[in-house]
């Protein structure tokens, strides 16, 4: 089954459409690539990304929720702000991911075997405010953006002057969830 599709949005950035009505972004420099977010952990995202780039891939997670992070289990180098470690542990559970996906346009379009295994965030590297990633002629800077979750991060692709925010700013940003910091964190 085809779980993924993509769209080139700049010379350096490809949007990847993932199961569960979410997107990831592949950012390519001359030497390296960064994958921002990995979705619900359905299907072989790593193999799909390999069809888009042959460069080494580092994963940067905007936050630890089940629709953005469980696909990270497939990748060797993963950064997440560790303030979201507990959120990731609670959201990576297979049944929670199934329950979520069944509320999306992807409901019923996968088999249980298509879900990647549960994974600990113990191997994740701590993503900190101000960290800068050099991809070769292209740079990404991480910025703390707490609110949606305590560890939410935004990524500035400097040369493209593009800021990727994950769920920190969109028409459906949750600030009422038990793990959210609320409106006051945005003030």
Task: Identify the residue ranges that each predicted region occupies.
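Conserved beta-strand hairpin/beta-sheet module of binuclear metal-dependent hydrolase folds
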Residues: 2-51, 154-170
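Residues at the C-termini of beta-strands that transition into short coil/loop
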Residues: 17-19, 63, 82, 146
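Short, hydrophobic/aromatic-rich segments at coil-to-beta transitions
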Residues: 9-15, 130, 139-141
């Amino acid at each position: 089954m085809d779980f993924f599709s993509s769209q080139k949005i700049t010379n350096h950035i490809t949007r990847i459409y993932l199961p569960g009505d979410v997107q990831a972004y592949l950012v390519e420099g001359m030497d390296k690539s960064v994958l921002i977010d990995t979705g619900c952990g359905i299907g072989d995202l790593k193999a799909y990304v390999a069809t888009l780039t042959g460069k080494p891939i580092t994963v940067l997670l905007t936050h630890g929720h089940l629709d953005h992070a469980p696909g990270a289990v497939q990748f060797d180098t993963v950064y997440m702000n560790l303030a979201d470690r507990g959120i990731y542990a609670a959201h990576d559970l297979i049944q929670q991911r199934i329950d979520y996906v069944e509320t999306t346009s992807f409901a019923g379009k996968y088999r249980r075997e298509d879900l990647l295994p549960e994974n600990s965030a113990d191997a994740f590297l701590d993503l900190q405010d101000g960290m800068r990633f050099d991809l070769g002629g292209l740079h990404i800077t991480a910025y703390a953006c707490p609110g949606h979750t305590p560890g939410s991060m935004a990524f500035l692709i400097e040369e493209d002057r593009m800021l990727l925010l994950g769920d920190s700013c969109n028409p459906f940003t949750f600030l009422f969830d038990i793990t959210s910091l609320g409106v006051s964190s945005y003030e």
